[in-house]
Swiss-Prot record:
This is Conotoxin Pu3.4. The modification 4-hydroxyproline is found at P61. The lineage of its organism: Eukaryota, Metazoa, Spiralia, Lophotrochozoa, Mollusca. Belongs to the conotoxin M superfamily. Its main location: secreted. It comes from Conus pulicarius. Expressed by the venom duct. It comes from the Eukaryota. The keyword Cytoplasm does not apply. It is found in: Secreted. GO terms for molecular function: ion channel inhibitor activity; toxin activity.
Length: 64
């Protein structure tokens, strides 16, 4: 088992598996676009790097 596992990982690396596509890490361009939209939001505080209350879906993360 100690030899079989490394051989299988070399032949079939986990990175070769298809991603599900619904995670933010799977969509870096959209993630960057979301950050840009947040920074342009009127409730966004650039010093604290969060949104003042009342926060809504257009501005994340909220300052607590």
């Amino acid at each position: 088992l100690g030899v079989l596992l490394p051989i299988c990982l070399l032949l079939f690396p986990l990175t070769a598996l298809p991603l599900d596509g619904d995670q933010p890490a799977d969509r870096p361009a959209e993630r960057m676009q979301d950050d840009f939209i947040t920074e342009q939001h009127p409730l966004f505080d650039p010093v604290k790097r969060c949104c003042d209350w009342p926060c809504n879906a257009g501005c994340v993360p909220c300052c607590f």
